Each structure stands twice: as structure tokens, then as C-alpha cells.
């Protein structure tokens, strides 16, 4: 499986506490920060909850 590059494109400020916690748990801080995470169910579930705040692309 390929990894996922997750980039924060909108701020997590003024969002629900659960959404802010997910952003922090993924290792995202400021807008435009990116992380590479494994493509598994846990990561995809977290992305589902904050899909409106991030962009996701597959990397090999």
C-alpha cells in the first residue's frame, strides 16, 4: 500500500474540539503543514472527519 501525504489547507481554529484533536493527532500544526502517514483504516477514518480541512494525495 502507498502512503498518504496529508496537507492542512484550512485552519483548525474555531472548529469542534474533536476536529482540532484529530488535526493535532495527525501531526498537523499550521496551515500548509504536511505529514506522510500509512494508508490504513485508522488514518482514513481520521481523514474522513476532517476532509473539509485537508487535502490528501497518495505517495509511493
UniProtKB/Swiss-Prot annotation:
Biological processes, Gene Ontology terms: translation
Gene Ontology molecular function terms on file: structural constituent of ribosome
GO cellular component: cytosolic large ribosomal subunit
Pfam families: Ribosomal_L30 (PF00327)
Record-linked Gene3D superfamilies: Ribosomal protein L30, ferredoxin-like fold domain
Keywords: Ribonucleoprotein, Ribosomal protein
Domain of life, source organism: Bacteria
Subunit-level organization: Part of the 50S ribosomal subunit.
Family indicated by similarity: Belongs to the universal ribosomal protein uL30 family.
Stored NCBIfam families: rpmD_bact
Name of this protein: Large ribosomal subunit protein uL30
Natural source organism: Leuconostoc citreum (strain KM20)
Amino acid at each position: 500500500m502507498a502512503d498518504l501525504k496529508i496537507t492542512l489547507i484550512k485552519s483548525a481554529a474555531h472548529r469542534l474540539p474533536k476536529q482540532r484533536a484529530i488535526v493535532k493527532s495527525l501531526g498537523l500544526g499550521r496551515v500548509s503543514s504536511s505529514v506522510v502517514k500509512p494508508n490504513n483504516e485508522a488514518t482514513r477514518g481520521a481523514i474522513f472527519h476532517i476532509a473539509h480541512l485537508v487535502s490528501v494525495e497518495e505517495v509511493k
